[in-house]
Every structure is written in structure tokens, then in C-alpha cells.
Amino acid sequence: MSYNSIRLPQDLPIYYKNFFPVKPFTKWLRYGQNNGDYFNRREFAFILADDVHIRYRSYNDEHAFFKALSSTNPEKLDIGAVYNHEPINNKRHTDYQAVERELVFDIDLTDYDPVRNCCKDATVCPKCWKFMVLAVKILDFQLEDMFDFKARMWVFSGRRGVHCWVGDKKARMLNNYQRSAIATRLNLFKKNGQCEVTEGRAKMTKVPPIVRDAFNVALKDGVFEKMIYDQGWLDKEDFITEYKFMSEVGRDDLRSLSETYKTPQERWNMIRGLFDDDYRKSLSPKDGLLDFKMQGRDRNYLLYFVLQRCYPRLDVNVSTGTNHLLKSPFCIHPKTGNVAVPLNVGKIEEFDVSKCPRIDHVVEELSSLLAERGNDENEDSKNRKFLAYKHGALAPYVENFEKFVSACIS
């Protein structure tokens, strides 16, 4: 049964008071510094019912932040930049400006609608989630390999997308120009929604490392092959004409072979046999594909076929502005009731969107969690403050979050 948003006014106060992980949250946004020197210059925005925005909120410490959060109970919480003055006093300063902010990325499933056949718009199913699995794996690899960013957190938005927060100091100190340069370099969708897998002059066939690495990550664990069958990409013969740089000779070869290789599984093996040099090494003459040798840009067909479908489709504007607001981890999506939970990249394929912690289910756990604590005979446990977010459905996601926080301040 889907979430009834009428419940939000009764669920939010219980959730914020008992389950929002305020201690690790404020520890993260302090980055090891004293409250009065840093945390108090961070902007928070509370979004209330009817999309009422309260911006430029700032707080001296964890206690003040939690008091405001648990008394206001916003439907959504956004995190902004660190400014040179306290945001709450922004109108007092003519030089008020953002000076620091995590590097962030936003990937939305609706941007995959041109290649997503199982669902459309805001609907998400397990087949859809594979798009996010590969997008996260590819971009996470690139952020470490290309830029040596270590503190990376991936958060399910609560409905149909994921957000990435990069907390390394060198990432937080980037200016807008540098952020734009990174986002532009990582974005392969430059014109007309087409993924560019080569660079240089029109007739050149140079494949940059970013493309080759993304391709290798995409094919590593077999997720992409499952997507081929889930989405029906090889059921029809559209795949023959989709690559605009393919020569007529190359198209004729594909068309001819597709009459022999008719099932999606056969066609996938055929395509790899024609365009994947490593895969070709495993073929024998009897397979009939070694007689075909693609030339020029035809050789890049498989790169395009794969990355057009699974390369991260970034909302570049989210990444370029230091002062951009982004939805906080552990806030609630008001329409689905889902908690925006940090993900474990190593286990991202196991994440089931339909089983994401939902606010009504989370708050309903409280009585049983308190009862379990009451039955605990360990006196030390009883004397410690009970942190409900350390127990129940949210616990593994809080653990993911705390690992990110540790990476940020180490």
C-alpha cells in the first residue's frame, strides 16, 4: 500500500524527535571544527506544507539545530553552503557570499526515459533501479580515479533518483568555475541527448579514458546484460540504425547478421563479437564473426550502445553552483513517505526501492524498540541515552552515513 501523505503532520514530529540522526548529522557538517567557527555559517532551508520555503536558517550548535528541526517539523530539509557570515544575518552584510560547499551531483531516472521501456515519469521498479546501479558505479569510480575524492556519499532521493555528496576538503573549496569544469568533463551528453564516446575532429576516432573506463565498469558485473533483456533493446532492429556515425557498410553487416542472430541473447553475443576486442579473443572461426572487422568509427558502436543507455545523466546545474540547495539525507519525500537514505555502493544492487524505509513504518517501530530496551537487563545500556536511529530499519543506513562522516573528518 502506498503512503498516505495525510499522515505527514502526525508522523514528522515523531520521526524528527526520535529517528533523525542529529549527532552524526551535525558532526558531518562541522568537519571537525568548533561550532562557532563553522557550523553556524551553514545555511539550512525548511520546506513546509504547500511548498512554503524558509531559507537562510543557521544555528550555533547541535542543540539549537535539533530544537528548530523538531519544533518546525519541515516536510523537506535542504542543505546549502557555508557562507562568510551567518545566513540568518544575511541582510546585514553587503559582502554576503558562499565560500564553501560539498561538490554534489544529482541523477534522476526520468532523464533515462528515452531508453527506459519498463516505466515512465516518476514510476520506479526493480528493472528501473539498474539504471541507478550503473550510474552510481560509474560516477563513483570516476570521482575517485580521476579526482582522487575519498569521502563520497550516495543518497536515494526517496522517489526516483540519487544524490552524491563529496565531502573532501579540496572538493568543498572548489569555486563555481572549477565545479563547472568537473561537471562538464564528467558529462558525456553534450548535444541532442546523444552520448559522445569520441573526441577530437569529426573524422577522428579517439576514445578518451573516461569513456573506456565507464564502459569497463558498465560491463563488469553483468548488470548491463540483464538490462538489455529487461528493456527489450535488442528485441527489434532499431539498434542497427541508432549510431549516427556508423558507415553504410557497417549497418549492412549488422542488418545481415541480425537475420541469423534473432534472439536478444544471440544478438548481444553477436554485437560483442563484432565490436569488443577482448570478447573477440574468445571466439573461434566457427562462430562466423571473425570474418567481420569493423573500421573507423564503426569500431565505437558498442561503446555508444552501452553508454547511451547507462552512462550517468547528470543535472549539471546542480553541481556548478556553490550556493545550490540540495535535499538533506534522512529527510522525507512528502509524496512517497520514503526516507532519503545513504546507500552502500558495494551493495547497491541489493537495494530495493519498494522496501526503502518509509516514515510511517519507521515511527511504528518506536514502541517495540522502546519495549526491547525496557527488557534489556544490561544496566549500562539502560543508562545510556536511547538513539532510536541506531536500531530498526534505519540502522544500516545510519551506519553507511557514519562511514561517510568518518571519511570526511579523517
Swiss-Prot record:
InterPro entries for the chain: DNA_primase_S, DNA_primase_ssu_euk/arc
Entry keyword Plastid: no
EC number, as in UniProt: 2.7.7.-
Keywords in alphabetical order: DNA replication, DNA-directed RNA polymerase, Metal-binding, Nucleotidyltransferase, Primosome, Transcription, Transferase, Zinc
Gene Ontology MF, one: metal ion binding
UniProt enzyme class: transferase
Gene Ontology cellular component list: alpha DNA polymerase:primase complex
Zinc knuckle motif (motif): residue ranges: 118-129
Record-level GO BP terms: DNA replication, synthesis of primer
Catalytic residues identified in the record: 43, 106, 108
Function, as annotated: DNA primase is the polymerase that synthesizes small RNA primers for the Okazaki fragments made during discontinuous DNA replication.
Note: The bound zinc ion is not a cofactor. It is bound to a zinc knuckle motif that may be involved in sequence recognition and the binding of ssDNA.
Family indicated by similarity: Belongs to the eukaryotic-type primase small subunit family.
Assembly mode: Heterodimer of a small subunit and a large subunit.
Protein name: DNA primase small subunit
Gene from which the chain derives: pri-1
